[in-house]
């Protein structure tokens, strides 16, 4: 019994240039990987210093409110109230000075 010869599928030919859709001046210079690197790895800015781009920061943060300073003040207030309640519930420790 003879092994079957592999059949080769003919490749589809790309359409001629006159059928291609018109592109803008910027699109003809950049292809898909270029846009990827421009978007995710900027050459300068905050992402260069700490290693996270703006897109990564937006994707991986769990805070949806942009007012970080307001959130910090509110969190400090809640923490101080919680500590005050805990101190009131616990008896004062005896020290040697009194």
Curated annotation (Swiss-Prot):
One of its GO terms (biological process) is regulation of cell cycle. Residues 1-24, 78-98 are annotated as: Disordered. Its main location: nucleus. This is Nuclear protein 2. Acts as a transcriptional repressor by inhibiting gene expression at the NUPR1 promoter in a p53/TP53-dependent manner in cancer cells. Involved in the G1 cell cycle arrest, and in a decrease in cell viability and cell proliferation. Plays a role as a negative regulator of the protumoral factor NUPR1. It comes from Bos taurus (Bovine). GO terms for cellular component: nucleus. Keywords: Cell cycle, Growth arrest, Nucleus, Repressor, Transcription, Transcription regulation. The gene is NUPR2. Belongs to the NUPR family. Residues 1-11 have a biased composition (Low complexity). It is found in: Nucleus. Residues 81-98 have a biased composition (Basic residues). The keyword Metal-binding does not apply. Pfam families: Phospho_p8. InterPro entries: NUPR1-like.
């Amino acid at each position: 019994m003879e092994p079957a010869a592999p059949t080769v599928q003919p490749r589809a030919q790309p359409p001629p240039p006159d059928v291609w859709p018109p592109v803008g001046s910027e699109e003809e210079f950049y292809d898909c990987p270029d846009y990827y690197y421009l978007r995710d790895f900027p050459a300068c800015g905050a992402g260069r210093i700490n290693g996270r781009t703006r897109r990564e920061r937006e994707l991986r943060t769990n805070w949806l409110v942009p007012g970080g300073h307001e959130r910090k003040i509110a969190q400090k207030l809640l923490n101080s109230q919680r500590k005050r309640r805990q101190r009131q519930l616990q008896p004062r420790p005896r020290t040697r000075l009194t």
